[in-house]
Amino acid sequence: MASLKDMRVRIASTKATQKITKAMQMVAASKLRRAQTAAEAARPYADKMSAVISNIAGAAAGSPGAPALLAGTGRDQVHLLLVCTGERGLSGAFNSSIVRLARERALALMAQGKEVKFFCVGRKGYEQLRRQFDKQIVEHLDLRSVRQLGFVNAEDIAKKVLARFEAGEFDVCTLFYSRFRSVIAQIPTAQQIIPLVVEEGTAASTTSYEYEPEEDEILTRLLPRNLAVQIFRALLENNASFYGAQMSAMDNATRNAGEMIRKQTLVYNRTRQAQITKELIEIISGAEAV
């Protein structure tokens, strides 16, 4: 059995850990408010951008001059999985849930005879995926040096993806990220971004519009920007999801530390009481012997 001194050291260590997890919980809660506001503010713009493009694309999708970002390459053989995760851990299942969804999609595609490539944004996803798909990771982008996520970061990713598409390196690109719903609910999401999936209801709209310039020219300008907008939205959703998951994880860790301290203190008090009782018995026995 551990000595009383060892028990005191263990209790003090657990209390120190509890202070750290509590501080991390408070920091995550503070950052979550800003991240959640940014993610929710980006949703209407991203949704409206998709709706406008879908409306225009409904008439242009079948035309010979339709942009490749809309019409695709005509093949479905090479898939690029754009996996966006966090740069840090201590966030529960946030990173692993995104990686799990991407891994399942990759294995399903490979089982169908498709070729799969990975573009990893974020250190944690890259570290997990390279254990199984090291040779299939074509690019890894580290955002640890970025203090504040901006549209320029999404544009940089979009340009890299677009350059690979124009070079004929893949046919389909799917974006993986975590959609923020609440502090305790982050939804791993897969969204096809190349070629753009046109919403059926919008594409079938009977409302007729006249466009100036022509639909194909408008789409040629809008589609690359929409790619960056959807990636930016995913980064913001991921950021909010990360802080929500971290806040929840640190809250659980703080509660668990409190329970451990309670149990350790109980064992310490019982051991101390037993030791005092033993010493008293020895003193009494010695007095009686005299």
Curated annotation (Swiss-Prot):
Function comment: Produces ATP from ADP in the presence of a proton gradient across the membrane. The gamma chain is believed to be important in regulating ATPase activity and the flow of protons through the CF(0) complex.
Compartment(s) where it occurs, according to its Swiss-Prot or TrEMBL record: Cell inner membrane
Membrane-protein topology: Peripheral membrane protein
SUPFAM superfamilies, per the entry: ATP synthase (F1-ATPase), gamma subunit
Keyword Cell inner membrane (UniProt): yes
Subunit structure: F-type ATPases have 2 components, CF(1) - the catalytic core - and CF(0) - the membrane proton channel. CF(1) has five subunits: alpha(3), beta(3), gamma(1), delta(1), epsilon(1). CF(0) has three main subunits: a, b and c.
Domain of life of the organism encoding this protein: Bacteria
The gene coding this protein: atpG
UniProt GO cellular component terms: plasma membrane; proton-transporting ATP synthase complex
Family membership: Belongs to the ATPase gamma chain family.
Protein name, UniProt field: ATP synthase gamma chain
Principal localisation: membrane
Gene Ontology terms describing biological process: proton motive force-driven ATP synthesis; proton motive force-driven plasma membrane ATP synthesis
Upper lineage: Bacteria, Pseudomonadati, Pseudomonadota, Alphaproteobacteria, Hyphomicrobiales
Keywords recorded for this protein, A-Z: ATP synthesis, Cell inner membrane, Cell membrane, CF(1), Hydrogen ion transport, Ion transport, Membrane, Transport
InterPro entries listed in its UniProt record: ATP_synth_F1_ATPase_gsu (IPR035968), ATP_synth_F1_gsu (IPR000131), ATP_synth_F1_gsu_CS (IPR023632)
GO function terms (MF aspect): ATP binding; proton-transporting ATP synthase activity, rotational mechanism
